[in-house]
Regions:
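Beta-strand-rich domains and repeat architectures in extracellular enzymes and scaffolds
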Residues: 1-16, 29-57
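Conserved beta-strand positions in repeat-built beta-propeller and related beta-rich domains
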Residues: 2-5, 54-55, 62-66, 105-110, ...
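Structural signal for beta-propeller blades
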Residues: 8-11, 68-70, 111-114, 171-174, ...
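Short loop/turn segments immediately following beta-strands, especially the blade-tip
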Residues: 13-22, 73-78, 118-126, 176-185, ...
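Beta-propeller fold detector
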Residues: 23-32, 81-87, 125-139, 186-193, ...
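Beta-rich, blade/repeat-based domains predominating
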Residues: 32-53, 88-101, 134-160, 193-210, ...
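Aromatic- and glycine-enriched pocket-lining scaffold segments that form the walls
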Residues: 104-184, 189-195
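Blade-level signature of beta-propeller repeat domains, shared across WD40, Kelch, NHL, RCC1
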Residues: 304-340
Length: 340
C-alpha cells in the first residue's frame, strides 16, 4: 500500500498468512512526494488506482502526486526494487491503468490529463502521441472543492479497446476513449453525462459490464459499454451510506463499495445481464474507509483517517468476516492498495 507522505511517498509491503492476516515486512521510498488535494479529509488523492500491480510483468506502479511523477518497482516476492521515477507529464497524478504492456496515468489538476507509456524491458517509455488534455472544470482556489472537482480514475476495458476516465464533479461524466491497434488513442473521448452522480471509480464485472460508484447519491451503477464508446445504464442501487467512492471485485460475482462518510463497506452481487441482483450486508470498518483490494477469499480495506488496513474473509454468502486490522505508521490519508 502507498502511504502518500507529503515529505516523501512510500510503498509499504506486507506478507499475507494462509489465514489472511497481514504482517508488515518492508517500506520502500518511491523517489517522489505524496500530495493532498484541497478539501481532502481522509483521501489525499481522492482517486482509485494510485497503486497498480502488473502481475504478468511483476511490476508495481505508484503515483507521486506531490512531485508530478510516477514510480516503477520490480516485485521480487515480498521485496521491491525501484527501477524508475519519471514525469507524469501533467499536474498531480492520481491513478494508473495497466494492460498488456500499455500504461496510462491520470493527472488530476489543471483540468486533468492522461499520458500513455509503453513498457520495454521492464521500463516505461513515454508515448508523445498518447497525451490528452481533458479540459475539465477547475475548482475555485480556497473553495475546498478540489478533491471533488478533479477526475477519479483511469481504467482499461477488459478487451483493451477502450480507456475510461471518471470525472467526479469536475465533469459529471464517464469519458471513454477508443484505442485503435494502429492509430492509438482517439483524439477526443465520448463524454457520457451523469448529472449529479459524481462518478468516482470503476471496475468491470465478470460479464464485462461497467460498474461505477456514484458519490452524489451514494450508489453503485452498472452499464453496458458500447462499441461506440457510449454507455447504457442497466441498474443502480443505493448503498444507503455516505460518500460511496471506491469499488473492488471479490470472489465470484461479489463487489464491494467503500463508503468513506459512513466508515463502512457495502457488498453487492451482480447478475448475468448487469443487474445488481442483491445488496449484501454493510460492514463497519475503521474510520475513513477508502481504497480496497482483494485476493482469493480475502478483502483488505484502507482506513484513511488513522492509516489502518482492515482484514476480511469473504464468506460463501458474500458476507465479510473480520480478521482484525493493522495500523500502518505515517499512512493517514494514504490511498492505493493492491494484493498479489
Amino acid at each position: 500500500m502507498a502511504n502518500d507522505r507529503l515529505e516523501g511517498n512510500q510503498v509499504v509491503v506486507f506478507d499475507r498468512s494462509t489465514e489472511g492476516t497481514l504482517t508488515q515486512v518492508g517500506t520502500y521510498n518511491s523517489g517522489g512526494k505524496g500530495g493532498k488535494l484541497e478539501g481532502a479529509v481522509v483521501d489525499n488523492t481522492a482517486s482509485q488506482g494510485a497503486l497498480t500491480y502488473d502481475e504478468a510483468d511483476h511490476l508495481l506502479f505508484a503515483v507521486n502526486a506531490g512531485s508530478d511523477s510516477l514510480s516503477v518497482f520490480s516485485v521480487l516476492g515480498d521485496r521491491l526494487a525501484l527501477r524508475q521515477v519519471l514525469s507524469s507529464y501533467g499536474k498531480f497524478p492520481v491513478s494508473i491503468a495497466v494492460r498488456a504492456g500499455s500504461v496510462y496515468v491520470l493527472n488530476a489538476e489543471e483540468g486533468g490529463s492522461i499520458q500513455g507509456y509503453g513498457v520495454s524491458a521492464g521500463n516505461l517509455v513515454p508515448i508523445p502521441s498518447a497525451y490528452r488534455a481533458l479540459g475539465l472544470s477547475v475548482a475555485t482556489p480556497g473553495s475546498g472543492e478540489q478533491f471533488t472537482h478533479t477526475p477519479g480514475q483511469v481504467a482499461f476495458s477488459p478487451d483493451g479497446s477502450k480507456l475510461i476516465v471518471t470525472t467526479k464533479a469536475a465533469g459529471q461524466s464517464v469519458d471513454v476513449f477508443s484505442i485503435d491497434p494502429v492509430n492509438g488513442l482517439s483524439a477526443q473521448p465520448v463524454v457520457n453525462p451523469e448529472p449529479g452522480a459524481v462518478p468516482f471509480a470503476t471496475t468491470f464485472d465478470k460479464q464485462g459490464h461497467l460498474l461505477v460508484t456514484e458519490a452524489g447519491p451514494s450508489a453503485l451503477a452498472s452499464f453496458q459499454l458500447n462499441e461506440s464508446g457510449t454507455i447504457s445504464q442497466l441498474d443502480s442501487v443505493l448503498t444507503e451510506q455516505a460518500a460511496t467512492c471506491w469499488v473492488e471485485g471479490g470472489p465470484g460475482n461479489t463487489y464491494y463499495t467503500s463508503n468513506a462518510g459512513s466508515s463502512s463497506i457495502t457488498g453487492f452481487q451482480s447478475g448475468a445481464r448487469g443487474r445488481l441482483l442483491s445488496k449484501l450486508q454493510t460492514t463497519p470498518t475503521h474510520p475513513g474507509t477508502v481504497d480496497a483490494t482483494s485476493v482469493g477469499r480475502f478483502l483488505y480495506v484502507q482506513g484513511g483517517k488513522e492509516g489502518t488496513v482492515d482484514e476480511f474473509e469473504v464468506e460463501s454468502t458474500g458476507a465479510l468476516k473480520s480478521l482484525g486490522f493493522i495500523l500502518v505508521p505515517s499512512a493517514a490519508g494514504g490511498e492505493g492498495i493492491v494484493a498479489g
